[in-house]
Each structure stands twice: as C-alpha cells, then as structure tokens.
Amino acid sequence: IQNMSQTGSWKDINATGESGLIDKNVFSVWINHGLNPENASYQYIVVPDKSINAFRDLAEQIDFYIAQNDGSVQAIREGNKYGFVFYKSASTKMDDGLVISSDKPSIVFIEKKGNTYTIAVSDPTYTQANVTLTLNKKMIEKSGVTITEQGNNIIFTLPVGDYVGSSVVDVFTEK
C-alpha cells in the first residue's frame, strides 16, 4: 500500500489529454505475486466507500458466478448483471446459457431485464473504431444511437476525440 505525490499529465496516458502537468496524491494497492508464478490466480472485487460492517454485510450477500478468468476473458455474473473484459478476440459462456464473443479487446457490461438487454461497451485500448459483439440471442435494436445490428452480431461504433474510451450504451430486445 502506498500514498504519495505523483506528477504527470493526462496526455501521458491519453493522446487527446491535456499536456499540462498535475501533481496529486495517488493511493496505490498491489499484490506481490513473486517471481514467475505458475498456474497462479486470484479474484477480487473493489468496494469503495463502505464501512467494515457494511462490507461484511455485502460479503455475506454477494453471489457471483465467475465463468472465466484468464488471459483471454474475465467474465462474471451477479443476478441479471454481467461484466466482461475481453483482452483479445474471444468467446465465453455463462452459467445461464448466455454466450458472448467480442472481435476485439473491449469492456462490456450487460443488464438483463426480462427480454430486454442494456449493453455498454468501451475500448480500453483507445484505438478502435468499432467492436462487434456476437450473442447467442437475436436482438431487435430498441433505440437508434450509433449501433447497427446484423442478425446476432451487434456492431458498436466507438467514440473518438475527447470521448475516446468512453462507453457506448444501447438497449436491445430479444426477438
């Protein structure tokens, strides 16, 4: 654990960021995995702004299903909410039968209510013009933002400029 002053600019981590230097206290936490760990894994959640008692209560109630946690995909479900980190083009299957693929690195969040899916997609690499998700569901586009649909392939057009890396969100209904 570390809390120390660090200096840098937003441009250091984002090509469209401002180049002026900023000096702020930065809190860091890390786990020392040792040298060359083999077949080692761990999982964790971040729970900000909770007292120790609130955290204990939450820990007793949480019921996560972890479908995959490797170098290709991190996939988790809690109730009707799904979270995915695709490190490369990959596919994963959840315990309730949902199968999802991404053609590129992406971060995806899905919330399912009945036959309606709210899907949020972002590009952690800040380099992609679009991401295609393939689901084992046929969807009807419910709201028309910058997303086109082809069968069970949903193509998300990603933001550029000042908004690069931000999420694109749309709502779909299963056919």
What residue spans do the PLM features occupy?
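A surface-exposed beta-strand-loop module
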Residues: D23-N39
